[in-house]
Amino acid sequence: MSDEDADEYDDQSSISSVSDDDDFSGSESESYQDTTESTGPSEATTDEMLWGRRRAPVCGIAAQAVRRQILMNQQHEPNVLGNNKKVYQTFGSTPQLANERHKEMYSQIRRGDDSSFRSRDRFVPPRRPRMGYGSSDLSAIEEMSPIRSSTYSSSSEAHRLSSLRAQTEWKPQLTSTTTSFQPLSPMNHHDKENGPFKAPMSPVCSSTPRSQRMYRKNPKYRRQFGSSLQLSESRLEESTSQESERAVTPESWMEHNNENEHPDQMMFAKPKQGSFPRPEAFGLDNAYAKHKDIRGIIFLSMSLCGRRLTLNVQNAAYFCSAARPTSVCSYVSAVLCHRPSSQSSSSSRQYRQRPDECYRTRLVTNCNSPSFDESFYFTFSENCVRDLLIVTVYEMDSNNAEKKRILGCMTFPVSRILKKASQVVGDPFPHYRRQDPMEDVEINNEGFFLLNKDQGRKQNFPQRKVRRQTFYEDPAFTGVSSAGSSVISNNTGGQMTMASPRLSVPNELTMGDYYRSTGSSDMRGRSTNNLLDYTSASSSTNGSAGGPEKLKLHRATLPSITTTTSENNSDDAKSLSPEQSPTDHHFLCPDDNGGVYGAGPAHSAIKKSSVRRAASFTFSPKHSSSKTNLRQLNGREEDKEKKRFLGPISRTLSYLRSKMDLALSTSSLYPSRDDVRQWEISFESLLNNKFGCALFRQFLKKEFSDENMDFWLECEEFKKMKDGKKSTTQKAIEIYSEFVAEHSPKEVNLDSDTRAATKAAVEAGCKPDTFALAQSRVEQLMSKDSYRRFLRDRLFLDLLESYEITDKEDKPSSSKDKN
């Protein structure tokens, strides 16, 4: 057939094709094998109507079915289409190249007269835009949009080019708008030969510099497809030729949707390095934490409900540096250690045999900031005042569970927990009956630093105890004016103007809490500007330097306005400046030592050697002293003589004197020789003497049983109160709640009958003899147990030996006087 005839037939024919979605059955395929039996026009295409009934199908699944059927029938029936007509198959079973695969749109079947049909290069597949005339490679161009419907399935076509939409090399920087890729719907049908369909991996919101910088952060991340899309014909041909050689990542579409994540997060999902807790984050200085060996902090909360303590272990943070980035496997242990009282009784022996209550949390592995969030419950007994609650944090080796070490610990005395509960409630805790409902009382809810083993067994370090000192709280910075004016702190040879600020004097207005609490004598560089202006009626200091009048830095001491002036001493005139008139007080500045009175306790501690203190205005002759001074000197001599006789226990006596009533005279405070000897004989004489009670209480404090002496003294004071008053009833309730009630902060050792009788007496009505029975029981207990050990203690023996030494010294002196 000539070319002109081919063009003529091309213009007249109406070309149509088989749809990709058509489902060809086996009956339709058989109609193409033997076309002599088919009569309906629906069994053949338009080209078969034009060229004849023996024309093969054009393309699609029908063409594939015909080819397979021809190959199967070629062995048995080689002449299917007739005796004089032979079929020639030009295709083979070996795969063709990718650039030539698209050219074979249908099977090239020769006719009986050996004339071949025309080439169908311009035949366009269905559902694809017709590209017109031009290069044959342009027929493979598909839709350029990166979004593809989920209903489209690529399984309907065989050996076709994979779409450019399936390439993960597509980058959003080629578009002019911000792009967000979200899967429209999961694709359930995939072609296993071509690999699963994947959307391009890119951030949710991206732009050109952002995406380039993002992929450049991690050099280990390598994209599967390095070439980018270029809108040019040559680049398109190159990408289509290399499409079959690219590898597809075998990752399922239905897995975790990680297309909006950063490539570093998708491929290298490891814990972040460098985010380690530091002491500065919790207000603690790093140097101090290293010096005290503080390795972390743990957050605890405690609440008390009657006899039940709830300990909640919240979370912790372990301090470590970047040089040691290892994670910690840790757990927390809480132990309630029972410590019986020093009194040897049957109840204390039973309490000593009681086992400790121990709890521990779960093990948190490889974490420097673990979160435990576990609660433990402890029940306090009657003799729990001396018990200790110890919280310990252990670090365990991940490979060997037997290897562990203490990261830190802390100790909470039960007596202090009960004391805090009483402070929160307002009354001594617990002041409830067992049948009354009780609410939870919050004791602690804060962080506690992990101390080492030695310090943690004795105390705890809460986070609120850290003193955060800033630059404006430092005394070195408070002496400089914020307005930029200078403050004179040294006696230099310069001059100051009339309106210049003076040296500040510490008083109630200018002195803060820091200076009231300190007794330092050096106030230079610490004092703040005085709020009083001595040159005008206003109380503000003027920072402007103006005025021609000058005053030299000579300070004059003003006399006190509280003293009566009779006649001035000759020494007072020397304190004034010789260049100025003594009556010109307009430019005089008050001295630090005596100018302003009533400046607080720190005023008397200020001393300066450069300024002379003013003399007294009342004249008195030399070598004259008042009667008051004589009495003071005589009292001091008597005190020295008493201390010399007492010998090595003078410090103890001084301490006891400071604790006792200061109004007592010296003779009533220090015991005589007969009193000390009487203490050794009778326990009642020891209790009836105030010094003896103080000394005996000091001994009981060493044995942790001073609550017995405190209860005895409170009962003695209660006997002196009047009956029937409200204060008497309130005092009785306080004594019962503090000493007699069960689980009280200072519970004394009483039997159950005595405790019940005392409780009934308090409820019946407060009388002077309400605590008589309990007081007698405690007195008997002290006389049989503590008093005997007191007589053998070094505190009493030193006092007794001191009087014996003085007796030996007095005997030789008395014999000399007789001679």
From Swiss-Prot:
Residue ranges of every copy of the RGS domain listed in the record: 682-800
Sorted UniProt keywords: Signal transduction inhibitor
Region (Disordered): 1-51, 112-135, 149-259, 515-594, 617-640
Biased composition (Polar residues): 32-44, 173-185, 517-533, 559-568, 617-632
Domain of life of the organism encoding this protein: Eukaryota
SMART domains assigned: C2, RGS
Biased composition (Basic residues): 213-223
Annotated Pfam families: C2 (PF00168), RGS (PF00615)
Biased composition regions of type Acidic residues, renumbered to the chain: 1-11
Biased composition, class Basic and acidic residues, residue ranges: 112-124, 234-259
Biased composition (Low complexity): 149-166
C2 domain residues: 290-429
Record InterPro entries: C2_dom, C2_domain_sf, RGS, RGS_sf, RGS_subdomain_2
Keyword Ribonucleoprotein: no
Cellular component GO terms, alphabetical: cell cortex
UniProt-listed GO biological process terms: negative regulation of signal transduction
Gene Ontology MF annotations: GTPase activator activity
Function statement: Inhibits signal transduction by increasing the GTPase activity of G protein alpha subunit egl-30 (G-alpha(q)), thereby driving it into its inactive GDP-bound form. May organize egl-30 into a stable multiprotein signaling complex, and thereby persistently inhibit egl-30 when triggered by calcium or phospholipids.
Subunit structure: Interacts with egl-30.
Note on domains (UniProt): The C2 and the RGS domains are both required for its inhibitory effect on G-protein signaling.
Protein name: Regulator of G-protein signaling rgs-7
Organism name: Caenorhabditis elegans
